[in-house]
Design a protein with these regions (language model features):
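Conserved Class I S-adenosyl-L-methionine
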Residues: 191-229
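A short acidic, Gly/Pro-enriched loop at the edge of an enzyme's catalytic core
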Residues: 102-114
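Short alpha-helix
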Residues: 172-195
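A short glycine-rich, Lys/Arg-flanked "PGG" loop and its adjoining helix->strand segment in the class I
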Residues: 127-139
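Class I SAM-dependent methyltransferase SAM/SAH-binding core
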Residues: 50-52, 56-103
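A short SAM/SAH-binding and catalytic strip from SAM-dependent methyltransferases
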Residues: 113-126
Length: 229
């Protein structure tokens, strides 16, 4: 059996971008997105929002649809930002920037709401990443974060994809709930809500192979955090 190459995020998303739409396109993403949208304020009118690790722009679309006055998307992958340009129609309400979660190219306290969906696992160190998300969010503002649930890697699941007929995996670090709790407590981020969504069997394509265990365990870990100071 040929080993699946494990790529760093920039290399991986350069290959993945051409087939990566601006919506949840697999059962895990749909479960994660339902959890994140349930924790997101319904009315974002007048608010500045930030999508850190915006990819092709799926959460930017949701926030603009909920009335955000201005949305900024940041991503490390030039290919994914190019995809977002094609997918989004935010006009002057949306700005896209190349940058890393380790040094977001935005001013302190810019966002009323910061979203970071399924990205934190691409970085080895959780606390500095949360610190940077907090810096970009105003005091009293919200940070919504999600990641692949640590149960997944423990069961041998990988974040993988196909490009040009070949399968690849994306490098991923495992962050336990205890790591999140400790980092938030140290930084002054209040954990207001935690969700651990399960797969919806209706999202699994007919005839597709799925590990039966995947229907019995959480597939994502999602947090609603508030910057206290």
């Amino acid at each position: 059996m040929t080993a699946v190459p494990v790529l760093d995020p920039v290399e991986a998303y350069a290959l993945w971008a051409p087939s990566y739409p601006a919506h949840a396109h697999n059962p895990v993403m749909r479960a994660e997105e339902r959890a994140m949208l349930a924790m997101m304020p319904d009315d974002l009118r007048g608010q500045a929002v930030l999508d850190a690790g915006c990819g092709s722009g799926r959460y930017l679309r949701h926030m603009l649809a909920r009335g955000a006055a201005h949305a900024t998307g940041v991503d490390l992958s030039p290919a994914m930002l190019q995809r977002a340009v094609r997918e989004l129609d935010g006009g002057d309400r949306c700005t896209l920037r190349l940058g890393s979660l380790e040094a977001l190219p935005v001013p302190d306290g810019q966002a009323d709401l910061t979203v970071c969906g399924l990205v934190v696992g691409h970085l080895e160190r959780l606390r500095p990443t949360l610190d940077e998300l907090m810096r970009a969010t105003r005091p009293g503002g919200l940070v919504l974060c999600s990641d692949v649930h640590p149960i997944g890697p423990a069961l041998g699941w990988r974040r993988d994809f196909k490009a040009a007929g070949r399968r690849y995996a994306v490098r991923h670090a495992q962050h336990l709930y205890s790591h999140w709790h400790a980092a938030c407590a140290a930084l002054g981020l209040a954990i207001e809500e935690v969700r651990e969504p399960l797969l919806d069997p209706a999202d699994i394509p007919s005839g597709a192979y799925f590990d039966p265990v995947a229907l019995a365990v959480p597939v994502a870990l999602a947090f609603r955090l508030r910057r206290l100071h």
